[in-house]
Amino acid sequence: MIVFTVKDMTCNHCSGAITRAVLLLDPAAKVRIDLSSHRVEIDPAAADAAGLGAAITEAGYTPVLVSAAA
């Protein structure tokens, strides 16, 4: 499980954009988003934390890695 906080994720549009960015990189990933805590949890199938963070950044957001447990 890879967890990011994304403070500039504030609405459903933001969460959808982040989900799409993650799934473009890793189509089999499972993404859970909690808007109230600005938390993005990703259970990746193929991508690593660096790649996922880069994908979220490319989508226009500022991810901060919280944890990257296997």
Language model feature labels by segment:
Residues 1-70:
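Flexible metal-binding regulatory segments at protein termini and peripheral loops
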